[in-house]
Amino acid sequence: MRDSSMAILPEDHPLQDLEAFPVEALCKEPFLLPEKGSKAEISGIFEHSRLTPHVPFPTWGNDAILSMVESGLGVSVLPQLVLRRIPYRAATRPLFSRLS
């Protein structure tokens, strides 16, 4: 079984009302890329779309990423399984690419 990746963004993000989040929009925001775990899979999403995210600093751990997103420090992508029962105030959306 393959776990889908989901965009995670602050609840007050201007695009949080979209049904699905465009991968291209992730490159217009500070992107919180995990240093371990799902880094290769997430990097592959950008490579497939020929995009380069703006990663302002290394981020360790899903909880740190979720807390930073909740605080408005950036957006991220995490596996759907991680996001099933998050205690953080953040919006999650499926991803799509206009370039695919």
Language-model region placement:
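Short beta-strand-to-loop elements that line the ligand-binding cleft
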Residues: 33-35, 52-64
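Short secondary-structure boundary segments
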Residues: 11, 36-38, 79-82
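Secondary-structure junction motif
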Residues: 15-16, 29-49
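Beta-alpha-beta core module
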Residues: 3-4, 18-20, 63-100
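Residues at the C-termini of beta-strands that transition into short coil/loop
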Residues: 1, 11, 35, 95-98
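Conserved functional loop/turn residues at catalytic and ligand-binding sites
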Residues: 25, 30, 50, 72-73, ...
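Flexible hinge/capping segments at coil-to-helix
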Residues: 1-31
